[in-house]
Structure formats: structure tokens, C-alpha cells
Regions:
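Ankyrin repeat A-helix N-terminal signature
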Residues: 19-24, 52-58, 85-91, 118-124, ...
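Intrinsically disordered, low-complexity regulatory segments in ankyrin-centric signaling systems
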Residues: 1-35, 44-47, 67, 117, ...
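Conserved ankyrin/ankyrin-like repeat signature
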Residues: 28, 60-61, 93-94, 126-127, ...
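Ankyrin-repeat-protein effector appendages
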Residues: 1-16, 162, 172-173, 182-185, ...
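Eukaryotic tandem repeat interaction scaffolds
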Residues: 90-146
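Ankyrin repeat domain, specifically the short helix-to-loop turn at the C-terminus of the second helix
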Residues: 30-38, 63-71, 96-104, 129-138, ...
Length: 206
């Protein structure tokens, strides 16, 4: 696979920077950078090495790339970048390294959502906690389907302990429980319809 950029690699040649970062091989990443590889090189999908390293969960590789000047904001063809990938993976072990790159937390994924929304959807309790405590991510951002993180946690969650805790944290962070979806259905109404009694109780308490 080749993007035509230096160090991109090909099926017949050595792996490029992005592929190497996706393997979490910090030592070889360092060698490639020392050899002149572009730290913001992209693969055929537009993905950068630092984004690949976040998906790989390799904190040393992310640290190395950020220290070398990699942009954590560059988005690939699916609109993913290093910061947005955190919401998908929930891997808090790489959060510190991504934050060192001063990410734009307002950038959105292919669904128009911030990193907080998929983290809430997927039940990534510790990632939601960290994003709320350590970034200025908008707790009430509405994505393209018309859902906030609170709505997403209720609608796409399973009503279990993880999603209940996420709802609690979002409310404590000031999430607006009255923001409804495009059909005018509130988080409380969704929780009640789904039989998520613990979540409904949180949403009725003030």
C-alpha cells in the first residue's frame, strides 16, 4: 500500500510510518522518523500515524509521534483523528499523550459527534469521566442524528451499570436532560420506554 509519500511503504517494500504505528512499534517508528519520514504522513484512507497509534492503544508510540510534532487534529476519510478515536476505543492509557498534542475537542466524527458521544454510547465509563474532567468538550453537543451524549447513552446503551454511571456523570457535568431527539422524545421518556428504571430515576431527580 502506498500513498506516494516518503516512508508510506508498499506491498513489496518495508512498512510505512502509519502501518508501523498501527502495530504499536515505537522503536521502528522512531527509526522511520530519524530516516526522514513525514510525521503527518497519511495512508490510503487518509489516516495518520498518530491516529493509528491511538487505535492500537500504544501510549509510547503516541508520545513519540506527538513529541515529533504530529498533529492530533488531522482527520482521515472517515473523519477520525487521534482525539476522536479515544471516544471509540475508550482507551484512557493514551489520553494523556493525545492531550499533550492540544487537540481541538470541537472537531466531529462522521456522525457529527464529538469524542464524548461515542464514549457515552459504548459505555466507556472512565473515558467519559476523563473527557468531562480534563477537556472542554461540549456536554450538550448535538450530532447529525440529533442526539446529545445523554440521549445516546440512553438510546444506544443497555441500561446497565456502565450506562447508568455515564448518565449520572453527564448530569453532574451539567448535561441538559430536557434536550429531546428530533421526534421530541426526551432522555427520560426513552429510559422509561426501555425499562431503564435506574436511569429514569436519575433523570427525574433534580
Amino acid at each position: 500500500m502506498s500513498t506516494g509519500s516518503a516512508g508510506a511503504g508498499s506491498g513489496d517494500g518495508p512498512p510505512g510510518l502509519v502501518e508501523t504505528a498501527a502495530r504499536g512499534d515505537a522503536r521502528l517508528v522512531a527509526d522511520l522518523l530519524d530516516g526522514g519520514a513525514d510525521v503527518d504522513e497519511r495512508d490510503d484512507s487518509g489516516r495518520t500515524a498518530v491516529t493509528a497509534a491511538v487505535y492500537a492503544g500504544s501510549a509510547p508510540t503516541v508520545r513519540l509521534l506527538v513529541d515529533a510534532g504530529a498533529s492530533v487534529d488531522l482527520q482521515d476519510d472517515s473523519h477520525a483523528n487521534a482525539f476522536l478515536a479515544l471516544g471509540e476505543t475508550g482507551n484512557v492509557s493514551v489520553l494523556d499523550e493525545v492531550l499533550r498534542g492540544d487537540p481541538d475537542v470541537g472537531l466531529t466524527n462522521r456522525f457529527g459527534g464529538t469524542a464524548l458521544i461515542p464514549a457515552a454510547h459504548r459505555g466507556h465509563v472512565e473515558m467519559v469521566r476523563a473527557l468531562l474532567a480534563r477537556t472542554e468538550v461540549d456536554v450538550d453537543h448535538v450530532n447529525d442524528p440529533g442526539w446529545t451524549a445523554l440521549l445516546e447513552a440512553v438510546i444506544l446503551g443497555d441500561g446497565g451499570p456502565a450506562h447508568t454511571e455515564i448518565v449520572r456523570m453527564l448530569l453532574e457535568a451539567g448535561a441538559d436532560r430536557d434536550i429531546a431527539d428530533r421526534d421530541g422524545v426526551t432522555p427520560l421518556e426513552h429510559a422509561s420506554r426501555s425499562g431503564y428504571d435506574d436511569i429514569a430515576a436519575l433523570l427525574t431527580s433534580r
